């Protein structure tokens, strides 16, 4: 799952990005949330129901300062709807390898640390999916990632911080 903007670029660079992300199995998500992200969540559910895996970054964007920000609840919703476990992954070193604005990654190493699965009971009706339950599961994911990565956790959405920084 990747931001929809990767699939909407113009010119040769835009076409290349769309081709690249599509060829490696990335599908677009409208990160503005709510009903606008439903087609991506539907696609993700279909992948999980086939017994396959996919990745989702709960922050929804790159961290503006290397800290770990509040997660969005899409992964929790998918887990509740499908009963699939969530495997938290801390990815370390990407900030140094490809700082924002660089086109070609620098040489270096990244590390992926896999956490213990978070098992969620599948629910049978939308009434069982409460905001509180979604937040509880999402917070468990971000706590696990923070523990593995050593990142400071910020209880605020990264996009909100980015917007404030650009004012």
Specify the residue positions occupied by each region the protein language model found:
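Catalytic core of membrane glycerolipid acyltransferases/transacylases, capturing the structured
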Residues: 1-34
């Amino acid at each position: 799952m990747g931001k929809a903007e990767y699939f909407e670029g113009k010119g040769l660079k835009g076409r290349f990005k769309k081709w690249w992300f599509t060829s490696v199995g990335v599908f677009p998500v409208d990160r503005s949330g709510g009903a606008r992200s439903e087609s991506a969540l539907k696609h993700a559910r279909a992948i999980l129901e086939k017994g396959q895996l996919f990745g989702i970054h709960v922050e929804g964007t790159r961290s503006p300062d290397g800290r770990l920000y509040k997660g969005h609840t899409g992964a929790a919703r998918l887990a509740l709807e499908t009963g699939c476990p969530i495997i938290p992954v801390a990815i370390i070193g990407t900030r140094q390898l490809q700082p924002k604005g660089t086109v070609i990654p620098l040489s270096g190493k990244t590390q992926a640390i896999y956490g213990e699965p978070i098992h969620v009971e599948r629910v049978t009706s939308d009434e069982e999916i409460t905001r509180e339950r979604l937040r509880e599961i999402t917070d468990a994911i971000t706590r696990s990632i923070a523990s593995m990565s050593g990142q400071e956790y910020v209880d605020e959405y990264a996009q909100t911080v980015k917007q404030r920084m650009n004012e």
